Amino acid sequence: MAKVLVLYYSSYGHVETMAQHVAEGAKSVPGVEVTLKRVPETIPADQAKAIGVKVDQAAPVATVDELPNYDAIIFGTPTRFGNMAGQMRTFLDQTGCLWMKGALVGKIGSVFASTGTQHGGQETTITSFHTTLLHQGMVIVGVPYACSGLVNMSEITGGTPYGATTLAGADGSRQPSANELDIARYQGKHVAELAVKLAS
């Protein structure tokens, strides 16, 4: 049984929605156990509520120590100036103990993201995230062009060969589109299929 963790941070629910669909795609693969978790919020609760952060997310909070239990980890993050969110960075900065042991070497790592605008850094967020995963010795998996949603030219849409993405709009009012959610499901399924092969 291959174990897949979908681990995300979401301020306003866009990445949370994407994460749920990534997990859905992974669950469609036989022989896979899928876990959906989030990283801890670092903004004090009163401040988070004041700025509209979605604090009532159902996914439980992950710990660094549990990461080696999975064969694949699919990370989700909003973009912060072309990089991952600080909450995800803070979580990953605590994985030095895992790096020392080589605990994540050979495990699959994959990333999906959200941005406020069409050219708001979705690709740089994912590719810069890959650097951390490579230092951990993880095997990077993206979204191949076999996923037809990547070549959809009929609408403004997220989605890259590096990973699924969604465009939230500068004010956060845009929700993930059907095409973006299809790509998210594809990414989850693709990673899960590879995890099964590596675990066998």
From Swiss-Prot:
Enzyme class: oxidoreductase
Catalytic activity field: a quinone + NADH + H(+) = a quinol + NAD(+); a quinone + NADPH + H(+) = a quinol + NADP(+)
A Gene Ontology molecular function term of the record: NADPH dehydrogenase (quinone) activity
Signal peptide coordinates: none
Note on how the cofactor is bound: Binds 1 FMN per monomer.
Alphabetical keyword list: Flavoprotein, FMN, NAD, NADP, Nucleotide-binding, Oxidoreductase
Pfam families attached to this UniProt entry: FMN_red
Residues that coordinate or bind NAD(+): 12
UniProt cross-references to PROSITE patterns, sorted A to Z: FLAVODOXIN_LIKE
SUPFAM superfamilies in alphabetical order: Flavoproteins
Gene3D superfamilies in the cross-refs: 3.40.50.360
Family of this protein: Belongs to the WrbA family.
Alphabetized HAMAP family for the sequence: NQOR (MF_01017)
Protein name (database record): NAD(P)H dehydrogenase (quinone)
Organism of origin: Burkholderia ambifaria (strain MC40-6)
